[in-house]
Amino acid sequence: MNTKKSKSSFNVQDKGLDPPGQTLSCLPWQHEEYDRIRRQQASGKLSHALLVSGQAFLGKSHFAHAIVSAMLCESAESISNDGVLGRSACGDCTGCHLLAAGTHPDFRSLRPEDSKLIKIEQIRDVIAWVGQTAQRSGKKVVIVNPADQMNHQSANALLKCLEEPAGDSLIMLVTSHPGRLLPTIRSR
């Protein structure tokens, strides 16, 4: 088996990302919400935090990554002839290539460590990172998945960041169990 990849190929499954340009084709029930978020982004009215919740295995992670891909794509904000924002990332620009390679400087993904919890050190690191200037896209994006796996200290540290957002950033909390999040996080 040949494991060598061409420069233009995308092997993003290992990175936990969805291939740019193929973002929502398998989730037609998500298009309306996706379009609403993209319109908010285009008008400058997108909140600094989003809670993506729902039953397990309905595409929450895929949806979150579709938003990240479109936000960090350097050509996805073009408006089509009918006035609608581009639905998905192009897959060809530098931003898409960096995201596919898992090296985009304006994106971080927080997942539980070996203990199966997202620890306070991870949250503190991402809070410090969010406070720095974005390098490519003008916006820094963080996905916390599953957000309900934060321990109490992590959740409180994240709450401070949600109450006092730093810079132009978006924090997406993805969970199948929103009731496990602190009520103060859910209300932000």
What are the functions of these language-model segments?
Residues 63-67, 125-126, 157, 161, ...:
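Alpha-helical scaffold elements adjacent to nucleotide-binding pockets in ATP/GTP-utilizing enzyme cores
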Residues 90, 178-179:
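Alpha-helix N-cap/helix-start and coil->helix boundary motif
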Residues 188:
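Long, charge-dense, solvent-exposed interaction surfaces that engage phosphate-rich ligands
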